[in-house]
Amino acid sequence: MSSVNSIPTATSTVYISVLPATATPSGGSGGNVLHEDLNKFYDYGNTSWILACTPLCLIMVPGVAFFYSGLARRKNTLALIMLSMLGLCVSFFQWYFWGYSLAFSQTGTSGYIGNLRHFAFIRTLADYSPGSNNIPELVFANFQGMFAAITVALFTGAAAERGRIGPMLIITFVWLTVVYCPIACWIWNPNGWAFKFGVYDFAGGGPVEVGSGFAALAYTVCLGRRSKFVEEQFRPHSVLNVVLGTSLLWFGWLGFNGGSAYGSNLRAAMAITNTNLAGAVAGLVWVIYDYIFRTRKWSTIGFCSGVVAGLVAATPCAGFVSPHASLAIGAITGLCCNWAIKLKSHMRIDDAMDIFAIHGVAGFVGTFLNGLFAVDYIAAMDGIYVGENKIRGGWFDHHWRQLGLQMAYICAVGAYDFVVTFIILFITDKIPYLQLRVSPDAEEIGVDADQIGEYAFDYIEERREYKHWKISPAGVPEEIIISNGVAQPTGNVAAPGKILESTNPLELGLTI
């Protein structure tokens, strides 16, 4: 264990070192492993815990991909998976390039965004991290990179069934730079304004959850509704994918929240406990509410949505509240997000994956309730917030102003996120070849066929025999008819089920 103690200057989970950057093990340069064993400055148990939590967070990205793909129609499944995985790659590059430095460089003192001191991960090898003096900065940087990647995976689901992939990749890089990194700096950088004000946000209620929710809302507004959204009731094509995605998300979330204690300690254990309780209760409340007041059915989709909402709400408060409070937070969140989806339907907002209703609303609720339920003894479980350094807590600890701080923080994050994201999307859509939305014909045949040319599901009985259909000048398959035994194109766009398939054109009409 390092002999240097961390002293919190605010009540976030990020701790600031008592030593200046030049007094770190490497003298602020990152260190030279050829001259000295830099591992000796750090506790192996704490470092191992964060290294283990990093791949746990990574598995959340395919979890999001499966969750979204199951909610979509079959002809748009693969595009949603590709958006999540391509977004993961763009996030890694951006985070390495300058994202980490803009969010966490401690020499940038504006309070709103960092500088380029750690451009391309320079000077990050073995310095004390902004998260804790117990782990090296390189470990911290990689762990935090997972948070950026997960946020992008959540946000990109807003393009479901009508968004183009290419423009989204460019938007991802820009959005991380001008939206995510500044918000992360506000709350997790020791120089950030929200950090200094004493806002409680344990693992990303603002940057990750509210950030992805309001960004998705802006994307939904810019894209507009899907064609036939009003006339048709779209149904998820694979409930099994939704359950699989939920399972991967829940599994990864334990590392996401547990690792945010930045050490192998009791606070990490409490964060995992609270995460499980909030997710479980929210899932139960959601499905029971639907059964009693709406459908009289035990909805699998409803259960999975409730679980995810509870996990989202636990993100900002898992390291600040007691298990009893987590039960209440899970129940409140399950009801609020359930009502939010119903309200979205009445307003005819086509947020196909319910990103705002689940992540935006649950992130808002969880972060706000931190100001009510946060208690000093939970934060003290990491061994840092003890004695004179203990937090003041929330209303239960008679710290009345904390709710106001939490509300101001959420409103600032939501407003900044929505406005800047909308501006990015609006400008991008006006650039030639970077239009956000696919053509109406492409939307009809499916984003998988238009943007990828591959299919998530391709059955033997639905063989694609190209001699029975042709590409129109618009670049989409034309429907054919049989006249006197001869196949003739009609000039109409083939419906998804008629792009098929059999060697006998008379069998056209099967559905995908």
Swiss-Prot record:
Query: According to its record, how does it sit in the membrane?
Result: Multi-pass membrane protein
Which species is the source of this protein? Schizosaccharomyces pombe (strain 972 / ATCC 24843)
Which regions of this chain are Extracellular-facing, per the record's topological domains?
1-47, 99-137, 189-201, 260-267, 322, 376-406
Single Gene Ontology BP term? methylammonium transmembrane transport
Compartments, as annotated in UniProt: Membrane
Q: Would the keyword Transmembrane turn up in this protein's UniProt record? A: yes
List the ranges whose topology is Cytoplasmic. Answer: 69-77, 159-167, 223-238, 289-300, 344-354, 428-512
Originating gene: amt2
Its domain of life reads Eukaryota
A Pfam family this protein belongs to?
Ammonium_transp
UniProt keyword annotations, A-Z: Ammonia transport, Membrane, Transmembrane, Transmembrane helix, Transport
Concerning InterPro entries, the annotation shows:
Ammonium/urea_transptr, Ammonium_transpt, NH4_transpt_AmtB-like_dom
Give an example GO cellular component term for this record.
plasma membrane
Which chain regions cross the lipid bilayer? 48-68, 78-98, 138-158, 168-188, 202-222, 239-259, 268-288, 301-321, 323-343, 355-375, 407-427
Claim: tRNA-binding is one of the keywords in the record: no
**Can you name this protein?**
Ammonium transporter 2
**Which family is annotated?**
Belongs to the ammonia transporter channel (TC 1.A.11.2) family.
Stated role? Transporter for ammonium to use as a nitrogen source.
MF GO annotations: ammonium channel activity; methylammonium transmembrane transporter activity
